[in-house]
């Protein structure tokens, strides 16, 4: 029988700033009620000027570690999925791993694949735990809105991050 691996801790961070659908529609001369009805949204989260997917990820990761009850140094891998990494050549994961104390032995990589990248990071972390390569791994999904001006995504794609600690002890979800 193979060991069960799953989520042992989770955390999220959503910026507190919001923009109303009416404000976006007013900018483009669009019909706000149509967007509100069609998207079933009234507002979306937006990051302040000093936040990006790295800072969102750090906050979510810290909350996940706290909920799991483990220190950052126990994280053996970290994979961050995003379509809005702030740097082209500097991995977001290296900054987040350093911020939570997971270095120097943490395997780190950034994933890109629109909405799927974060869950792929979780699956890779689970696989490494299941293989006995590491005790705990972390998968993070983080994004800031990337919609083109006037596009439906500009109305609906907000900002936030979710982090999941994967392990084989004290599972909260399989």
Label every PLM stretch briefly.
Residues 18-19, 89-92, 123, 148-154:
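Short acidic, glycine/serine/threonine-rich loops at helix termini
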Residues 1-50, 154-174:
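Condensing-enzyme catalytic core mediating Claisen C-C bond formation in acyl metabolism
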